[in-house]
């Protein structure tokens, strides 16, 4: 992944947070929120097998959290608490609740994905109420330029809770959590525009290996690994936002989808860890809401 240049761009920002006595009046803020990352999965928290040198560098010159606890074990409610500062006793979002009466079991339906792909009104989760105060709106009032890049999950397209309406001047990424289960989507959202990714094809996350495919043959998984890896596209937008606001106070909220399932990474990076950790003998061939994966441990490490 294209982390080297991104980390280099962010290090000056991170360095500011580590020197409280030298902080400017309005220091830039970069908040990283990883998705389903284990506490010990980064080098700065003691991990020895998975290599995370660039994140470790950010941690060394910034702030790491050792006593920050999530308010919920699910994506949307935990994000709601972070965005609003409310614990789950008062939070508006308390579950991964779909819109239009869709039930969890329905999420395995290809027709559901096709419908949300064709009509954005069927995309996304239960929205925050219009006018909700968030860290984005608070920072805007303080004179900051704000961006959220990554996964949103707190209100679908055409609702009152699109990121641009919740305090973020710029948004790029996944509006809907279910579509974020693929790292090779054929579209992402840029503000309120659905942007199709040339070279990637429509592939619902309930897709499976072709009938008769050999689950131990890496080529059987080719259809799930397309041209553009969504994280790389997000890194480019992050760098652009940082560059364009170099002279302005900004807050960047990077809600990366890594390393949430489906565990996917570019093949060369996965094979690096296959060689390092050893061949795996148990592929995931029926991942429920996620794609099949030949080397789940190595793919997780590569992410």
Give the role of each language-model region:
Residues 39-134, 138, 144-147, 158, ...:
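Active-site segment of extracytoplasmic enzymes that catalyze sulfate/phosphate-ester chemistry
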Residues 1-7:
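Bacterial N-terminal signal peptides that target proteins for export
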Residues 23-24, 34-50, 66, 70, ...:
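Active-site-proximal cap/lid insertion segments
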Residues 151:
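Active-site glycine-centered loops adjacent to acidic/histidine catalytic or metal-binding residues
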Residues 25-30, 61-66, 140-147, 166-169, ...:
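Loop/turn elements at helix/coil->beta-strand transitions in domains of secreted/extracellular proteins
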Residues 17-18:
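C-terminal motif of bacterial Sec signal peptides marking the signal peptidase cleavage site
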Residues 10-12:
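Hydrophobic helical h-region of N-terminal Sec-dependent signal peptides
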Residues 34, 56-60, 83, 136-140, ...:
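Non-transmembrane alpha-helical segments in soluble domains
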